[in-house]
C-alpha cells in the first residue's frame, strides 16, 4: 500500500518508455516509509473495523438508549455504524430488551440470515439473564446465549449510551485479533432452543358434550321445555314470563 502524499513526491524519469500507459520503476530508499507490509488477514480485519453495520432489533426500553446514539451528541457514525433494517445487510445485532419465548424463533431466524462473520451484543439485564422477569415470568427467555452466541455482554437497566460505545470499542478489538479460522468456525455448535419452564397440564373442564350430545341435559336437572325455551345471548339466559312466575299462579 502506497500513501498518496508520498507517491506524489516521487520523480518520474522521462527517458523510460511507457508500456501500456503505466511506468515500472525500481524501489529506492525514499519509498521505505511509504509501504506497509501486512498479510491478508490483518488487512481484512482492518477493513471491517469501520464497517460494522448493526441490525435494528429493539424489544423493550433498552432500545431508547441505543436510539440516542444516532443523534449528534454521541454520533456513532464516526465508528462506521450504519443502521440496517435487513439482516442480510448487517454484521452486528444488538439485542436491546426482553426476549420472550414467542419472539425467540424470530431472533434465531434473523441471526441465521446474517452473513458471516457476524457478531452479537447482549444489551441490558433482561437480555442477559431475564432481568426482573426471570423470577416469576413463564414467557421470558433467561438469557439469549441459550439461543445465539454472544460476543459482548453489556449489563445495565438500561445501559447508558457511553457504555454502548465502550462495548462497540471492545468488539472492534476482538475483530482486530481474529483469524480466518475464527471467522469460519461454526458458532452454532452446542446451541439449543429450550427452556427450563415446567408446565403443568390439567384436563379441560370443557368437554363439548353440551353441544354434540343430548346426554348432558339431564345433568342440569332442568325440564326439557325450560331448556328449549331458554335463549343464550352474551352469556346470559333469558326465559319466558311464565317460567318466572311461582308454581300455582300461572
Curated annotation (Swiss-Prot):
Binds 1 [4Fe-4S] cluster. InterPro entries: NADH_UbQ_OxRdtase-like_20kDa (IPR006137), NADH_UQ_OxRdtase_20Kd_su (IPR006138). GO terms for molecular function: 4 iron, 4 sulfur cluster binding; iron ion binding; NADH dehydrogenase (ubiquinone) activity; quinone binding. Its EC number is 7.1.1.-. Its cofactor is [4Fe-4S] cluster. Its main location: plastid. It is a peripheral membrane protein. It is found in: Plastid, Chloroplast thylakoid membrane. It is an enzyme of class 7 (translocase). GO terms for cellular component: chloroplast thylakoid membrane; respiratory chain complex I. GO terms for biological process: aerobic respiration; electron transport coupled proton transport; photosynthesis, light reaction. [4Fe-4S] cluster binds at residues 61-62, 126, 157. Keywords: 4Fe-4S, Chloroplast, Iron, Iron-sulfur, Membrane, Metal-binding, NAD, NADP, Plastid, Plastoquinone, Quinone, Thylakoid, Translocase, Transport. Gene3D superfamilies: 3.40.50.12280. It catalyses: a plastoquinone + NADH + (n+1) H(+)(in) = a plastoquinol + NAD(+) + n H(+)(out); a plastoquinone + NADPH + (n+1) H(+)(in) = a plastoquinol + NADP(+) + n H(+)(out). Belongs to the complex I 20 kDa subunit family. NDH shuttles electrons from NAD(P)H:plastoquinone, via FMN and iron-sulfur (Fe-S) centers, to quinones in the photosynthetic chain and possibly in a chloroplast respiratory chain. The immediate electron acceptor for the enzyme in this species is believed to be plastoquinone. Couples the redox reaction to proton translocation, and thus conserves the redox energy in a proton gradient. NDH is composed of at least 16 different subunits, 5 of which are encoded in the nucleus. This is NAD(P)H-quinone oxidoreductase subunit K, chloroplastic.
Amino acid at each position: 500500500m502506497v500513501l498518496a502524499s508520498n507517491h506524489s513526491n516521487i520523480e518520474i524519469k522521462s527517458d523510460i518508455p511507457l508500456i501500456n500507459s503505466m511506468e515500472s520503476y525500481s524501489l529506492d530508499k525514499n519509498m521505505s516509509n511509504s509501504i506497509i507490509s501486512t498479510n491478508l488477514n490483518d488487512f481484512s480485519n482492518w477493513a471491517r473495523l469501520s464497517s460494522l453495520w448493526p441490525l435494528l432489533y429493539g424489544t423493550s426500553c433498552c432500545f431508547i438508549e441505543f436510539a440516542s446514539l444516532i443523534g449528534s451528541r454521541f454520533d456513532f457514525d464516526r465508528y462506521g455504524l450504519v443502521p440496517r433494517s435487513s439482516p442480510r445487510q448487517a454484521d452486528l445485532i444488538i439485542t436491546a430488551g426482553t426476549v420472550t419465548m414467542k419472539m425467540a424463533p424470530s431472533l434465531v431466524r434473523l441471526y441465521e440470515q446474517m452473513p458471516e462473520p457476524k457478531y452479537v451484543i447482549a444489551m441490558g439485564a433482561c437480555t442477559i439473564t431475564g432481568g426482573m422477569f426471570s423470577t416469576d415470568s413463564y414467557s421470558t427467555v433467561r438469557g439469549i446465549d441459550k439461543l445465539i452466541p454472544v460476543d459482548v455482554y453489556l449489563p445495565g437497566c438500561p445501559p447508558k449510551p457511553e457504555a454502548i460505545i465502550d462495548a462497540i470499542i471492545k468488539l472492534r478489538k476482538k475483530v482486530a485479533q481474529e483469524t480466518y479460522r475464527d471467522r469460519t468456525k461454526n458458532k452454532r455448535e452446542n446451541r439449543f432452543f429450550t427452556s427450563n419452564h415446567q408446565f403443568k397440564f390439567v384436563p379441560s373442564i370443557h368437554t363439548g358434550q353440551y353441544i354434540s350430545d343430548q346426554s348432558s341435559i339431564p345433568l342440569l336437572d332442568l325440564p326439557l321445555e325450560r331448556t328449549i325455551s331458554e335463549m343464550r345471548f352474551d352469556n346470559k339466559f333469558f326465559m319466558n314470563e311464565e317460567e318466572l312466575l311461582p308454581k300455582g299462579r300461572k
